[in-house]
Amino acid sequence: RDVALKDLACVEFAGFVLMNFERDPVPFDEFIAPVRAFLDDLAIGEMRHYWWKSIPIASNWKVAQEAFFETYHVPATHPQLEKPAAEFIYRASEQKDFQFSHRHVAYDAFPHGHGRFYAGEKTPMAGNVQPQGGDPVEAMAARLQLLVDGMDAQVLQGDIDVLLTLRGKPVPSGSSLGAEYIKALYARAAAEQRPMPKPTPETLGMWGGEIFIFPNVMILPHAGNAMIYRVRPAGSDPDRCTFEIFSTRSYPAAVKPPRATLQRVTDLGDPEQVLLIPRQDLGNIPRMQKGLHSRAMRQTWLASHHEKMILNMHQAMDRYLRA
């Protein structure tokens, strides 16, 4: 009252503090409604700090986050994660029965600019598992280890430790290794009194997917963990932004979560500061920004399926700007 500051619409939700500078903003409950159930069911409000980094990127903030609104970049950007798909892309494999799983990813564009993508049909999460040689537990653990070593977020070492407890155990008739793994994760969490997402098909289907909260927050959930991106302009320079990565997780009842501390990255190319997968992702973005400044770049077309979240974001921004 003494300093006569203007009132600001501010809401605390799911661990976030969200602010709106509009004089007459859309009611928050209406704004968040399209994605609220996903966030609640994934227990995002139970996530706590694991690590947090701020990375300067030489690109516009919208370009930086658009790179994470589709999944088809994965085999080309991260060939170590999907070797058959990378072979198909880089070596022009003509294997006619090749199944490029990312074409089956489902995308949703929601009101107010929000969106999501998730596994969809004919993907491993939906039960379409390609036959592999050797021990399936070891093969699955090796795949997950690439994620742990490459980003230490979303999938954590403790998740692999749980998976490895299934070595030598037969998979019950009518079940699958993935289903048994999920049971083991939830059994461990129950014993530790650790909050977990709802074990429903809809919620489990979001593991490995993404929820976008307009205008600049992306949440990539997994088994009681979530990697969160927040992208912001860097001052008034349209060719620079600040890209933040939050590795979060829920904790057992007996464990006190660590206090959040920010690590400021000074060199994106330094593997001691940034792990392999975000280095690969974020290393692409400055080149994309340069391409947008090319004299030959007059217009771009967005794919109606794979890039619908990008289009939806820009349409929502256009509505705000026109208002």
Label every model-predicted segment.
Residues 5:
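Flanking scaffold residues of small Cys/His-coordinated metal-binding clusters
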Residues 1-2, 12:
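Hydrophobic, small-residue-rich alpha-helical packing segments that form membrane-like cores
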Residues 8-323:
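C-terminal catalytic domain of Rieske-type non-heme iron oxygenases
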